[in-house]
């Protein structure tokens, strides 16, 4: 059985880790980095770039470079949060046929799970390169406050990437696993404050140790799935745009290229202001008008940044209060505060968290890697490699059904430990009613319409008797991934109807299978592209070395031989610009053969074997170049 890897599929960055014996290890990607930007770009050459290569070309290709896709996963186009993003994202967010929020790139509509799968594929490839074996199973993390549709969509992304998702685990819980694995013994209650690129979670977790076995029990969780570093960046961007408009009278919001440059500059300024008191945002040639080019140069102080985002930090503390109340704990009863997510590096965030809890947060947990490490630990538990660890997570939102008068009747309360199962008996609202519709809801409001609709199904064939007589037993079953299964049974007739919740949105199995097939087809075309690039690199190397030898040999080369070599060089240069690998390889062979004479002419006193080898494509050099090209895919 292969390894089960742990993947933190983040809004801004993603990370993959695996257990090596009893120790988790973060795996570097092809570029040698421990985290990978969750950015996907579609180039004019029909190439898909993921991670740093995609980020590098974002400024010149803003409409086809997709980032923060996690904010759209499992969401409806009509959601308020999506409407806010439509105004600020340089790429097109569009409405899918099923009402979901999708993205349009080059006239093609793409589902968020399909896009996220590209990031997961890169994580999978990094793990395979490191382990030297295929990776087919993973534990993937999600924000604790993700609803059922968002969890389903994340699992779909895993399937499209060719991964069997063994478990969906909540990010703060994963961070607690990473923290608790090597932070000594004893019982502790910890708060995990997880402010990432696009989401915020707060979980109160109890770590108990009995007889060497550690139990991680989530007491309560709360959060905001649309609050994160991207929102902090947007505050800076809006400030810079407004300042520039005041100075120059030009609104940069209508210029996607300028907005992409501003996004990069805002992120850079935010990071710099975590250690410096002031930074210059300097973007020459940001735009132009009839009077000529315009340059943006604005000073930004830490104090100004803090004034721009202080309400966002304050907003994050409200879920903290609710989670503490739900857990029955006061801030003073929390033993340790763990900060997770890159945005927690901001001094203001650290100060406010310290002020709230009355204690300094721990600094010995890497905020970028803890979640992936925890996912790897859970992978080790599922594989049987990690013993004596028990994880008890909770469902973040209450679950119930709509009953008479448009009321939500709750069957499973929020913060119930999962997996769990709960049944309740309902009856009909009308005389002689032969069917009932079970409308499944998730949320905390009493008014059914104010909660998230997860879907509905019918139970038919009920005996036509006076209202209130039939006994319909509705059962909710939540699995360890937090995914919901619902059944309804008429106790009178024994008829039963059951479904795994597929929200009215989401991808159908057929759509997922099609996306899996597309991904496999792309993998084949990617392989052919890489082979073509390898052949071109061999050609470039041979052309360069042959020209160099031809120049050095000068008049020593007979005119007839020079003509033959020049002709072979020209043929290879022409072939290398084409798309046919076989033709390029044939021309490489032809040039290598005629270049042997040149090598002998250029080095008449040298080792003939050495001279001959110099004229051939140098496999080592080519492989290095080939790897570099592959990395950028």
Swiss-Prot record:
The keyword Metal-binding does not apply. It comes from the Bacteria. Residues 598-616 have a biased composition (Polar residues). The keyword Amino-acid biosynthesis does not apply. The gene is dnaK. The modification Phosphothreonine is found at residue 199. Induction: By stress conditions e.g. heat shock. Keywords: ATP-binding, Chaperone, Nucleotide-binding, Phosphoprotein, Stress response. Residues 598-633 are annotated as: Disordered. GO terms for molecular function: ATP binding; ATP-dependent protein folding chaperone; unfolded protein binding. NCBIfam families: PRK00290.1, PRK05183.1, prok_dnaK. CDD domains: ASKHA_NBD_HSP70_DnaK-like. Acts as a chaperone. This is Chaperone protein DnaK. Belongs to the heat shock protein 70 family. The lineage of its organism: Bacteria, Pseudomonadati, Pseudomonadota, Gammaproteobacteria, Pasteurellales.
